[in-house]
């Protein structure tokens, strides 16, 4: 099976998701999730950060954790193709891999 790119990269598609997509806010985690159905056969993910999120090492670690948790939970989205954008907006988050994985598992079931 060919490895698919699960990253969302097109600027036009990202703007469309921000405008037309559904929004879920998590005030206790300072996290927002936008999602919208796509016409592809697979789901895609984008993790972005607000301007207040400092430190490239921490940003890249959080991004890697989200992508890995999403990749492992991709089978829950079988038959549904959605584009998901996570906006992380606070620097002092205590995000562990297991917390992110349980968050994504619950969110995927809501989508």
UniProtKB/Swiss-Prot annotation:
Gene giving rise to this polypeptide: rnpA
Protein name, UniProt field: Ribonuclease P protein component
GO biological process, one term: tRNA 5'-leader removal
Top-level enzyme category: hydrolase
Purpose of the protein: RNaseP catalyzes the removal of the 5'-leader sequence from pre-tRNA to produce the mature 5'-terminus. It can also cleave other RNA substrates such as 4.5S RNA. The protein component plays an auxiliary but essential role in vivo by binding to the 5'-leader sequence and broadening the substrate specificity of the ribozyme.
Keyword line: Endonuclease, Hydrolase, Nuclease, RNA-binding, tRNA processing
Cross-referenced Pfam families: Ribonuclease_P
Entry coiled-coil feature ranges: none
